[in-house]
Amino acid sequence: MTYFLNSDFSKLPLCESIIEVSRAIRQDFPSKRVIEDLKHKVEVARNYVVSENLPFLKLRKLIKLFYKNWKFECASGIYKLSDVLWLDHVLKTHKGTAVSLGIIILHIAQQLNLPLMPVIFPTQLILRADNGNGNMWLINPFNGDTLNKHVLKVWLKGNISPTAELYNNYLNKVQYFEVVRKMLDILKSALMEERNLELALNVSNVLLKIDPKNPYEIRDRGLIYSQLECDHVALTDLIYFVEHCPDDPISEILKIQIHSMEKKVITLH
């Protein structure tokens, strides 16, 4: 993970950041192939949109190229969530999630200087383009469809709460750095669910390099260590969380787990 530690990836272009963290997590991540594939797609896209003069019209052509011509789409059927998050798999299959598809098209738009930015909506990543005249174009990265406020309200009520409201700040643009964190959070959860604990631990360690004192990240690392039966290390992380977040409801559950683990460690000694 040395190269990751030496990189201030928050200042890197989006896909370069994702490639850096992917290399830190997966030893077999094919960085060279991914970089070459992305460069090729940028050049094809550049030639495809060149006939348009206005950035907004270029962006519309890019959306058409990405979803209609290249046929990038949301994954369906039976699949592992982690497979539709890794950029190498998504570039190979053209099937991904909102965040992985969004990352690729954001990268291409960034390289072409097109006005596309990420929005971390409560239900998923969405894309936003401003035309400079006060008009905002919201795009679903799953399929390139235009989103309106009615659809967003339905998403909130269906996924968050029947009483959820749509607030303006839900549509605020975020920095690419936040997209990297979002992807890592989803990837960590997916790997834990798939019982790929060694890779999940690598993701957790990357997140802790970004935010070393985040008690929730430390808690998750402790839970992974406990599943790997590394109780000694797990105890340190879980106790840290309980001490720093005593009012969190999960702390009471963790106290029981900590007590059980402490008895086990004492017995082994």
From Swiss-Prot:
Which residues are the signal sequence here? none
* Superkingdom classification of source: Bacteria
Record-linked NCBIfam families: PRK10941.1 (NF008188)
Q: What's the protein here called?
A: UPF0162 protein bbp_163
A Pfam match is: Transglut_core2
What InterPro entries does this protein's entry cite? SirB1_N, TPR-like_helical_dom_sf
The UniProt entry's sequence similarity note says: Belongs to the UPF0162 family.
